[in-house]
């Protein structure tokens, strides 16, 4: 009985949130840090942290459907940082396998999302990197769904360094010298060589689990992003929590440094 009452109240509250968002500004690019999977498992009395990651992976599909409903154009999912790659293999490899499974689910026929894996994929186990590339390649050309970047082996500082290297390599391959490169180098060169082909700046970054730091996520793209911290662990993240984040964004005055 109590569960039914709670569900009814949640449904009413969601309708209210949807009404409040009507005609309000919405982010076009959301970056979300899927944090708290291991702590969720521990809180739930589950000894195996992999079950927390699996629960978090299942939540991804729900989240993307909410983004479709809210007409969000672009989402970046922060699933594995480059710092995480230093974890022991017995912890890391199962997590990477779960991420690959999630990406393969997103790529399954019938789903609308074009998916790209962004990050230092060359640092991943070769088989896992191949699975990610194969799955994401199958989604290219899709239209109608939210564009999804899956950040795996991702670090914001590494992305900027790699972008500069890529820009320098391109310049050199065209016969340019280093002095010319230094003289003509601009911020646009970095933006052009970031991991994601979409090249859109982030409007809103959401981090679950109550942690209040960005940990290098979308370091270049988040210069003017609004940030929303949510206490809920990622596997328990609800559409209500998502709509609250959108409402928080809609009520802010974005100044873009002015």
Curated annotation (Swiss-Prot):
Mg(2+) binds at residues 35, 226. CDD domains: Cis_IPPS. Its EC number is 2.5.1.-. The active site is at residues 35, 84. Keywords: Magnesium, Metal-binding, Transferase. Belongs to the UPP synthase family. This is Isoprenyl transferase 2. It comes from Streptomyces coelicolor (strain ATCC BAA-471 / A3(2) / M145). The gene is uppS2.
